[in-house]
Amino acid sequence: MQTRNTFSWIREEITRSISVSLMIYIITWASISSAYPIFAQQNYENPREATGRIVCANCHLANKPVDIEVPQTVLPDTVFEAVVKIPYDMQLKQVLANGKKGALNVGAVLILPEGFELAPPDRISPEMKEKIGNLSFQNYRPNKKNILVIGPVPGQKYSEITFPILAPDPATNKDVHFLKYPIYVGGNRGRGQIYPDGSKSNNTVYNATAGGIISKILRKEKGGYEITIVDASNGREVIDIIPRGLELLVSEGESIKLDQPLTSNPNVGGFGQGDAEIVLQDPLRVQGLLFFLGSVVLAQIFLVLKKKQFEKVQLSEMNF
């Protein structure tokens, strides 16, 4: 009987341990997967610094182009498209975290004027939904609905990202006015070179931390290298760790200098930022303009008719 109770206790403990381990795995996996596209959100209250620089450039060091297309003018309480273009060579492959080569992903941050926000699903037309695809946009902060982020998403499918934007209505939002507003955008393709904690990823160049002679290069079992450098100044050994996926530029016995590249640069992506302007137009001004243009057209028509009438009178007088 005691043996049976012992086995039962062991079985319960094993089951509990497995459940706890599984729960930890799920929580950890979820936090990692959801944290990757929101590194900037976790570390910066505002994605645009006072200098105008978007903080994504702190991790994505290479400079690449990005473009944004928005209408010149929009009316209050209407939905419009903001199209962010992140061009790159679709044939390129990047170094993944596991050291293998894979396709590039893309991401973007869109900084709208105060009052502008992501359009609700019921306001988005079927044509616009088709352009958006399966993208899921997030607010940068719960209280910053005018700043939107997306990514990482497959670059081959979403090198052009369509944001559905709802324009504010000054009639219901007294903080909004009929003015010209700036829009800022940042877009990246590929992985970053630096993590938010300041450590390097395996998508950048690794340099020698000391000058001297390379006495040993050890290839690690799971990939990557340990490079032992004998410091020329004091004879001590310095070991530089190279993560997997990188190509070495040095060999054993070679003399190297401090900060000399030990690997080639694997990065094929980069980050870019741009801006555009949009006018929130007063409908009354549009109506006034249409009325003015209509008046001008009518005046021209009356002038033409008057001229023809005058010509007829002159012609009849000449006939007499």
Swiss-Prot record:
Coiled coil: none annotated. Keywords: Chloroplast, Electron transport, Heme, Iron, Membrane, Metal-binding, Photosynthesis, Plastid, Signal, Thylakoid, Transmembrane, Transmembrane helix, Transport. It comes from the Eukaryota. The keyword Ribosomal protein does not apply. The keyword Thylakoid applies. It is a single-pass membrane protein. It is found in: Plastid, Chloroplast thylakoid membrane. Heme binds at residues 36, 56, 59-60. The chain crosses the membrane at residues 286-306. InterPro entries: Cyt-f_TM, Cyt_f, Cyt_f_lg_dom, Cyt_f_lg_dom_sf, Rudment_hybrid_motif. Its cofactor is heme. GO terms for molecular function: electron transfer activity; heme binding; iron ion binding. Residues 1-35 form the signal peptide. Component of the cytochrome b6-f complex, which mediates electron transfer between photosystem II (PSII) and photosystem I (PSI), cyclic electron flow around PSI, and state transitions. The 4 large subunits of the cytochrome b6-f complex are cytochrome b6, subunit IV (17 kDa polypeptide, petD), cytochrome f and the Rieske protein, while the 4 small subunits are PetG, PetL, PetM and PetN. The complex functions as a dimer. This is Cytochrome f. It comes from Crucihimalaya wallichii.
